[in-house]
C-alpha cells in the first residue's frame, strides 16, 4: 500500500511539473514550454531596459520575448499573458533602425535624422496580435523567453 501511494504521489508531481509545457520541453517551475523554448509572463511594470535586465537574471539565456511566427505568438497569448491586465507587453525588439541604411525616395542620402530615438522599443499588443514602436522609458508588463 505504501509503495502505491509513493508511486501515485510521484506521478502526480511529474504531471504537475509538466502541465502547461509542450512534451519534451524541460522548463523551470512556473514557465511554459513551446518549440524548445520556455516562457514566463511577469505582472511587474518595468521600463524596457529594466525588464530586459530582469529577464537575463531569471534563467540562463533568458531575454525579453522574441516572436518568430504566428504559432509562437498564439502560444504566448494563450498560455502566458492571458492573466495580464492590459494585454500589452514588452518585446525584445529594439533599436532596429540605428544600423539600417535609410534613404529618401528621391535617392538622396539620409544625412539628417530627427526622429525620436527614445521610441526605439517595441510592445506586443496581444489582443490585436501586432507590434507597436514606443518609448523605451514607459512601463509595461513583459514576458521572458529562454532556451529550454
From Swiss-Prot:
SMART domains in UniProt: CLECT
Official protein name in the record: Snaclec 1
Residue pairs linked by disulfide bridges in the UniProt entry: 27-38, 55-144, 121-136
Additional remarks: Shows greater sequence similarity to the beta than alpha subunits compared to other heterodimer snaclecs.
Predominant subcellular localization, coarse grouping: secreted
Taxonomic superkingdom: Eukaryota
Matching PANTHER family: MANNOSE, PHOSPHOLIPASE, LECTIN RECEPTOR RELATED
Assembly and interaction partners: Heterodimer; disulfide-linked.
Gene Ontology cellular component list: extracellular region
